[in-house]
């Protein structure tokens, strides 16, 4: 059986605000019967982008259906602003590959560098021929310059047809990390509320570029956050029940005490749980809040729901008196509102 040549023309990478979208194939010259032209449209979802924040490095593995490497592409693409609604940036690349008796292709995309240790000065160096190792690659959190500088990955499969020479392939690359914001307020303008300490607990020491694994080698640590001091902002009304209304009062009625990237942690269900003491063997993220209200000391531990990759979670905390608090959890993707969780008391 003769070799078939597949020509990959014009990988179009789209930085979007609202997930995948359909893009018409780029018009190309009609290929010969021994060529296949594949157009790759890679959708990269983002939220909270400042308009200039673009991924810095692209790595793309093109494999057969058994994950044998056909071609590897690595570059630092030049991004161009897009006039298309819902699209921020566009870049393109070209490559040609030869195949023989291949029925399908697998694509693995990694954007930006990842590090295997916080002490590393060089990013992870991939064995480009070992796809199994690629899919099991773990990484640690480092300092990122923006939402689109974090590690992002995407996969796709393409079934080849006997007489088809041109394909559209859309790869949705998503961030491999979560993001968490914590906000505090009080319910009485006459009260004096001071945060003594905030601890974020059960932080996984590593995450995975692709699928999250059940990994007994993950260690969970706790970190004391930098914020401490008086909370002067007040919110006395009932908590809103939607994201838009919360955003309207967030800046005026709540003090932001934390806002940063986190590793994915799939322990936990859909509920927030408020307790006075840590729960043994519970590996959910938790917030330990130590505070003084009108001279009385207290502390609460708030166990969070699952912290999934590419999701932005906001925890709103209102301290009513020395022993009772209200909480509200808002979970959204960086691209659109995915889920609203009602207030838990």
Residue ranges and their predicted role:
Residues 49-126, 183, 187-311, 335, ...:
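Tryptophan-paired
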Residues 16-19:
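C-terminal motif of bacterial Sec signal peptides marking the signal peptidase cleavage site
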Residues 24-31, 304-345:
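Short, polar/proline-rich extracytoplasmic segments that appear immediately after membrane translocation
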Residues 160-162, 172-175:
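Interdomain boundary/hinge segments at the C-termini of tandem beta-sandwich modules
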Residues 80, 115-167, 295-320:
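Structured interaction patches on ligand/partner-binding surfaces of diverse proteins
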Residues 91-93, 167-171:
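Short strand-edge motifs at loop-to-beta-strand transitions and within beta-strands
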Residues 24-46, 173-187:
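A short, Gly/Thr-enriched small/hydrophobic beta-strand-prone motif that recurs across taxa
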């Amino acid at each position: 059986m003769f070799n078939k040549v597949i020509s990959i023309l014009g990988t179009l990478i789209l930085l979007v605000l609202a997930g995948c979208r359909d893009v018409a194939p780029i018009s190309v010259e009609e290929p010969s019967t021994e060529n296949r032209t594949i157009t790759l449209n890679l959708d990269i979802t983002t939220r909270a982008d400042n308009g200039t924040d673009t991924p810095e490095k692209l790595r793309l593995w093109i494999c057969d259906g058994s994950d044998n490497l056909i071609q590897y592409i690595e570059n630092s693409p030049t991004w161009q602003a897009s006039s298309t609604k819902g699209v921020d940036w566009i870049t393109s690349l070209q490559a040609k590959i030869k195949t023989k008796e291949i029925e399908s292709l697998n694509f693995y995309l990694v954007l930006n560098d990842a590090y295997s240790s916080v002490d590393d000065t060089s990013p992870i160096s991939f064995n480009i021929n070992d796809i199994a190792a690629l899919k099991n690659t773990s990484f640690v959190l480092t300092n990122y310059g923006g939402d689109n500088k974090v590690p992002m990955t995407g996969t796709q499969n393409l079934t080849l047809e006997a007489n088809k020479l041109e394909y559209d392939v859309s790869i949705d690359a998503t961030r491999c990390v979560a993001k968490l914001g914590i906000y505090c307020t009080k319910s009485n303008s006459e009260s004096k509320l001071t945060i003594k300490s905030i601890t974020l607990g059960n932080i996984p020491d590593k995450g995975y570029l692709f699928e999250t694994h059940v990994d007994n080698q993950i260690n969970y640590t706790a970190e004391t956050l930098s914020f401490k001091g008086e909370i002067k902002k007040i919110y006395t009304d009932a908590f809103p029940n939607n994201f838009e209304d919360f955003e309207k009062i967030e800046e005026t009625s709540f003090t932001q005490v934390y806002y940063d990237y986190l590793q994915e942690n799939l322990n936990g269900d859909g509920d927030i749980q408020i307790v006075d003491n840590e729960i043994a063997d519970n590996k959910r993220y938790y917030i330990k809040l130590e505070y003084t209200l009108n001279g009385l000391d207290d502390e609460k531990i708030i166990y969070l729901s699952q912290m999934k990759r590419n999701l932005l979670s906001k925890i709103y905390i209102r301290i009513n008196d020395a022993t009772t608090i209200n909480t509200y959890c808002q979970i959204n993707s960086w691209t659109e509102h995915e889920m609203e969780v009602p207030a838990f008391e």
